[in-house]
Structures are given as C-alpha cells and as structure tokens.
Amino acid sequence: MKVVTKLICIITSIAVSTIFAAKAPQAKQAAKQDSLTVWIMPNGASPQEKLEQRLHLYTKKTGIKTKVVVLDWGEAWNRITTALSSGVDAPDVLQLGTTWVPYFASRGEIKPLNEWLPQIDPSRFVPVSWNTTHIDSDTTIYSVPWFIDIRPILANKRILKKNNIKPEDIATFDGFVKAIRKVNDSHETLDDGTKVRAFAFPSKIDWNIPHNFAPWMWSNGGDFIAKDQEGKWKANVLSPKTIYGIAKYLSFVLDTLVSTDALQMNTAQIVQHFNAGELAFIVNTSEVIMQTRIEGEKGGLLNTRIGNDSVMALPIPKGTEGSICFIGGSNLAIPTGNKKPEALDLLLYLTNDENLDAYTKQIGMLPASKKVLANWSKDDDYKTLVPMLGTGRAYTAIPEWGDIEQILVAMFSAIWDHLEIPALYSEEKIYEILTKYSNEINKRLNNRTPDGLTFAEFRETWHKALNIKETKKNTPHITKQPAPTTEELEDSGFNPTPWIFAIAVLVGFIFAVIRKKKR
C-alpha cells in the first residue's frame, strides 16, 4: 500500500510540474523593447539629421531605439489630426505648433502632464512660452515648450552700413519709414543688375499673413480678438486700435514704400530675395541668422551673399504702445492613447536644458529655457532677441484659434487683392472686408456681439493712421508724404506705361469719333 501511495505521489508531482511548466509566463524572458517614434516638422536645415544626432545619445543611454518622421507643414495638420483621432499609427512624442495645442487638448487627444510637473519644472521656461502649453484660463498642462519662433526685423548689415543707417534710426515707425525711403532712393543695383529694395513682405498666397500683421497691430494696442463684458471672446478687428495698426502696416504699400510685386510672393520667396542680398529688411524667423554660420553643403548660407553681408536682428519699430514682436514656436506632446512610460522619459529628455541648448543652436530658433537663454545673451547676433521675449506676444491659446487664423488669412488676402490695383483703392471696400470677416470670427466664437464701429468712425481712425487730412470739400488727401516719382512707381510694382498707352488710344478713339460726326 505504501508503495502504491508513493507511486501516486510521484506521478502527481510530475503532472503538476508539467502543467505549471507549460503555463509559465513568457515575461520571464528578456522583453524586446519597441522603438519610440517622434514626429516633427522641418525645423531649420537638415531637421531629421539634427534631431537624430540628439536621439543617438538617448539610445546610447537607454538602449531604446528611436525613429524620426518629418512632416511637411502643409501635410502636418491632416496627418496629426487623423493619427490622434483614430489612434492608428500615432507617434509616441510629437511636435505641435503652439496654436495647435489648445485644439487637440480640447478634444482630449493629447495627454495631460500635470502629474509630472515636478520633473518638467515650469519655472525653467519664459512665461510667453509656458503660456502656450495649455488652454487659456485652464490649469491643465498638455505640452512642454521645445523652441521659440520669434520674428524680429532682420536687417542686411552691408546695406545698412552703405546707407549710414544705425539700429537706433529704425527704433520708431517714422524712423523705419525714413530708412526705407533712404535705401529705395539710393537706387543701388547688385552685380547682376538686380535692384536693391528696402523692405518686402508676402501677402495673399501665404499662411503667415496674420503673423505679419500682428506685430504692427499689437504695437499700436490692437488685437484680433478680445473679451466682451461677459468674459466671452469676440472679434476685435474693428476696434480703433486694431484698425490703426492694420492701416500702419498697409501704408507701406499705399505709400509705395514696398513693391506690389511682393504681394505675389510667399514667405520662402521673400526670404530667398533677402538671402540674395536684394532686400535691406524683412520680418522673419531667427533661424536665418544661424544659417549664415552653416556651410552650404549642410543646408546653410555661409558662402551666400547674405552670409557675406551678415544679418542683424532688430526690434519691431515702436508704435503707440511700444515694440511687440510675434512669438510662436513649437511644443512637444504625447498622444492620449500612448501607454509607453518611455514616451514621457523621451519627452523629458528632449526638453532638458542640455538638449534645448544643443538642438536650438542647430536649427537657429530660440530655446524656451531661461537658463539656456542666459547663455544665448552672450552671442552678439542673438543677444538683441532675448529681451524681446519680455515684450513679445503669442496668440491667445483657445481651441478655436486655428479656424480664426484661417479667417484672418482670407480677410487679409481679400485686402491685398483689393490693393493690387491702386486706382481701385476704396476705404469703403476695406471697411466692408473687415466687417465681413469680423462677423465670421464672431460666428466661430459663438458671439453675436456687434462690433459697433460705423464707417464714419472707421474712416476717422483710418485717416489718422495714414496722416490724411480733410479738405474743405471733405475730400481726403495724404499729408507729409511726397508724391512718388516715376522711378518709385516702377519700384513699387506699378508700371505707368500701359496705362499711358491705353489712355492715348482712348483719347484718339474719342477724337476720331468727334471728327467723324462733324463730317
């Protein structure tokens, strides 16, 4: 009996061991770590290569492989929207333009980061950048600043020196206008016969249009939107201060200081003309400065004309409310559906001070870290930019901003369309355009509050901004502005020859008809 009992125990023991062995969890084996994917946009020259250099150090440190996917800005919105809404093929960490953060946050598609704020340390970042990490009036943080896109006046040092123009000469709007006239009046031509012009900017075919208007509007106390008495956002396009700032910016074209040829170009084309040494001033991102230090084979501008001429960054000329430049940039975020703890580790790695310093120096954008910016202040070409962060402004962080920005693009495009033919310029038409799109902004904000500015009130502010006085017959005329010469008209993009020919033909036709009738 004892033998039988012992035999049964042995068999049972073997069976149980076999069962447990069969069900042993495979996790005991070394787990294979998935790679982490980062989505970015084209930041500076060779964006993928530059980020991969930083991520190589991360892989060396952690053993986790990474993959960088570069999305063109034109496709980025749709790709990101699809990935975040569906959760299919979404990245682990992604770059978002600062104005995109509120939209995806409001949809619950990017992960709240408040739990990790001690590791992030908000006090490290400049306020204007940290304010873009969340929705306006909300305390939930959804992203971490990566770099700052600040847009100052960029000046060609050689052209300024040739015309004896100093930085303090263009500190005010009137001073800037005088400098523009001085360069235009010099009638300089380059070796290839190209005329040097003072200032140019893109218009109706460019998504940067609101960014171009914003500094001149903000510097005169205006804004695209504002809160009403109930604390709700509403359109502010037809407020006197906004109108004043818009008129000041349009005056560059109305006073033939800027060629209407530029109105057919986009930002890339304008920058190309600046890089070719054909423009004294543009308003653009600071990356151009860094590119002049990078060899051409690496995507830089070191051996180009602008590399030889050199670039100087200057504040936006002061308006009635000071000098306020546009500030944008990009933040890093994690999709809500991402369950990898390593994704947060990678985000923290990319936004630590060491990496912010190294990466921004490669792409030429400003870092958002106060400590890193202190070092940048020692750079002769960048030190003028750092103080601008204290007075510059970013767009209001609301979910509707993306749609509002598209409305603003359409509005300013319509205005530029109207200004293409100077003879058809009409204040009534400008007012009509602003009123139409102001109503569209209010509709998007679900605010039915009327702007209340009558045409007479609009006209009064418009004339004040453009230095227009009324004659006894109530016919406006512009003062303090000399009549443009034929050369200035040609420089502005207006060619009088076809008009003279057309008028001559018309007069000849009328004269022939009269003679025929007399017979």
What is each PLM-predicted segment?
Residues K178-N184, W216, D228-L263, M312, ...:
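Glycine-centered hinge/linker elements that transmit conformational signals in sensory
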Residues L57-V128, R158-N164, A171, Q272-H273, ...:
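Extracytoplasmic "Venus flytrap"/periplasmic binding protein-like
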Residues T391-R519:
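Conserved C-terminal helix/tail region of periplasmic/extracytoplasmic solute-binding proteins
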Residues S35-E52, D149, W207:
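Extracytoplasmic "Venus flytrap"
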Residues A30, G97-P152, D174, D192-R197, ...:
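Hinge/lid segment of periplasmic solute-binding proteins
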Residues H56, K61, S85, H134-T140, ...:
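Extracytoplasmic/periplasmic substrate-recognition and gating elements
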Residues N114-P127, A198-S203, N220-Y244, G296-I306, ...:
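Short, solvent-exposed loop/beta-turn-alpha elements that line the ligand-binding surface or hinge
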Residues H134, N308-I316, T360-D417, N467-K472:
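Long, aromatic- and glycine/proline-rich binding clefts that accommodate carbohydrate-like moieties
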